Amino acid sequence: MNSYFEKELKEIKASIHSLNEVVFEHWVEEGVQTINTGHKIIVSGLGKNVPICEKFVGSMVSVGMDAAFLHTNSAVHGDMGIVKDGDMVIILTKSGETSESIYLARHLKKRRVNIWLLTFEAESTLTREISNCVILKLEDEGDMWNIMPNNSTTINLIILQGLCMQIAKRRGIQIEEFRRNHPGGHIGEVLSNGSWHE
């Protein structure tokens, strides 16, 4: 069993190493600018990427940075009203060919928003239509058929959490912000009695 996990860890590590650091740095800088100018970062996905998006939003707001989740399906049925001029919208799609994501992207391009794509395919409809692309490589999903959204969603989570942490670091967010927003649970107790350690 350990050999399975070791193999998948290698897959995930290799995928993360395929990240273009210059592109990621640009993404972080634009994320900082988005938040600093009073706008928000919206992340959009569907299927198994939904909880990944929600985790990113939860991390962002827990340190006082405005973020929202926009379901790719319901976006074009009225939910796109959450998108305002100046916002950043991150679209998650492994293939870049998901019809719902393409439809959403084309409508977002009519607005004054900063669109980013997080994907695993360098050549796709969306990589051709969206100029800001974070493109990762992935050889194997880790399931029996190499088709289930398994390793790809894990990698999306790692990348988005990294984006959140880097934006927070660049903005100089202090532990007091997290303490104010997270009074509950064991974390809240640890923060309130000062027993946490950097």
Task: Map each language-model feature to its residues.
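Glycine-rich phosphate-binding loops that contact phosphosugars or nucleotide phosphates
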Residues: 39-171
